């Protein structure tokens, strides 16, 4: 079975001690690709370095993570825009989306940032990788106007309901990423996976 890790932050400091071993175990387990999203401007260099070491196996993405959206978001977006303009290395825009789990202080800003990055995805013909935490309806509201466009991507680490999964799959070129949460006793994901006929 071929596996693709659509979202990994293995370039972060906490994984530095055994990073090579993690890659070896991933290969042995059948993982053929690892896609790495930065978080914000502070993690771009480390991400690109990791992807350079494992070129052809680890692939870089670029974007502004919703939990990094604050009053300074415009400067962060300028950096993302510059990276997209001057580098052809990036395989996707991500991870992007909305996260209202912690608080809703920057809800409006998160919507603005998401919409901007969705437009870049269309401009540069790149897929998006979406982070969604307690924010499905808000994200769907941003994405819905793009339903008839070539926009494509994946909701990584999807934990939504069967109804929400169905709404995602209304987009002709969107996928849902399922991770270990599906094994939790109280998880409703097995029902969601069954309902949408997803292949794990």
What are these regions (language model features)?
Residues 53-71:
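Metal-cofactor-binding active-site regions of metalloenzymes
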Residues 25-30:
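Catalytic domains of carbohydrate-active enzymes, especially glycoside hydrolases
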Residues 196-200:
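Conserved small/polar residues in nucleotide/adenosyl-binding loops
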């Amino acid at each position: 079975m071929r596996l693709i890790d659509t979202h990994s932050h293995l370039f972060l400091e906490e994984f530095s001690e055994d990073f090579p071993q993690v890659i070896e175990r991933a290969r042995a387990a059948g993982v053929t690709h690892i896609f790495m999203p930065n978080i914000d401007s502070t993690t771009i260099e480390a991400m690109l370095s990791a992807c350079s070491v494992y070129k052809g196996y680890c692939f870089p993405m670029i974007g502004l993570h919703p939990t990094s959206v604050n009053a300074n978001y415009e400067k962060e977006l300028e950096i993302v825009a510059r990276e997209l303009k001057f580098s052809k290395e990036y395989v996707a825009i991500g991870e992007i989306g909305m996260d209202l789990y912690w608080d809703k202080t920057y809800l409006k800003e998160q919507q603005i940032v998401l919409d901007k990055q969705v437009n870049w995805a269309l401009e540069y013909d790149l897929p998006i990788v979406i982070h969604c935490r307690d924010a499905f309806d808000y994200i769907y509201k941003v994405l819905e106007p793009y339903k008839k466009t070539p926009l494509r991507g994946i909701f990584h680490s999807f934990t939504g309901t069967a109804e929400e999964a169905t709404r995602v799959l209304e987009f002709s070129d969107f996928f849902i990423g399922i991770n270990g949460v599906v094994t939790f006793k109280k998880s409703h994901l097995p029902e969601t996976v069954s309902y949408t006929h997803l292949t794990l």
